[in-house]
From Swiss-Prot:
Naturally occurring in which organism (per UniProt): Stutzerimonas stutzeri (strain A1501) (Pseudomonas stutzeri)
GO biological process, one term: diaminopimelate biosynthetic process
Keyword annotations: Amino-acid biosynthesis, Cytoplasm, Diaminopimelate biosynthesis, Lyase, Lysine biosynthesis, Schiff base
Pathway listed: Amino-acid biosynthesis; L-lysine biosynthesis via DAP pathway; (S)-tetrahydrodipicolinate from L-aspartate: step 3/4
Lineage top rank: taxon: Bacteria
Protein name: 4-hydroxy-tetrahydrodipicolinate synthase
Quaternary state and interactors: Homodimer.
Amino acid sequence: MIAGSMVALVTPMDAQGGLDWDSLSKLVDFHLQEGTNAIVAVGTTGESATLSVAEHIEVIRRVVDQVNGRIPVIAGTGANSTSEAVELTENAKTAGADACLLVTPYYNKPTQEGLYLHFKHIAEAVAIPQILYNVPGRTVCDMLPDTVERLSKVPNIIGIKEATGDLKRGREVLDRVSTDFLVYSGDDPTAVELMLMGGKGNISVTANVAPRAMSELCAAAMAGDAETARAINERLMPLHRALFLEANPIPVKWALHEMGLMGNGIRLPLTWLSQSYQEPLRQAMRQTGVLA
């Protein structure tokens, strides 16, 4: 079972926007050393929207090769074209990913039936474990619990990243699916509560900069140790919030650069963190102990 703290890994770039393979390797080692339970490559935080197909595949391949089976590697393969999502998922399987994360189609606003048929088609086309990803704040497409329940019965679909941050929604999804269907949080501030309700982990932005703490938080929450999990979460809350001062992954890439783990590259239309937000993020990093 894929569970625990799953980092939504950034894709390091140089100042010209080229992929920085040395920094990618450094980040993977960082997570292996700090107790991260799984790596999610080329998802939202990994800037999948601005990677070419060749770059997308190469990032997955390099992460898989370096991890070498020590922890699971999940590849972001969602698209707003069903055929493109199938192609990306096939490529991820060939590259050696353990599972795929598929965001709901964005911009074209499918119906719930369209969402069901989209994910069902991908699951039937590619034999690899697949995780649904619901993040309506970014996609303007909300996959409702009825649809999640239907899809949970489709072979190869093993779980969902529920990133609404709405704990009532999380509770409803948990109540509707079988216990072997994996419900993950995709919202750092509320992840601890979803796990205490039965969620199996957190696909985390914060884990990029505080992997050990996020791993300990997830372990405590999944063991039912609410006191420990909530205490860690309270300590991390300034960081959870500061990492969304601008659109993800702008702040987290700046934070990793500040920590000396990567360069200062990001691709247009995203831009480097605004000057006015740099000191507030730096202070949050110091407050939570990730920066001296």
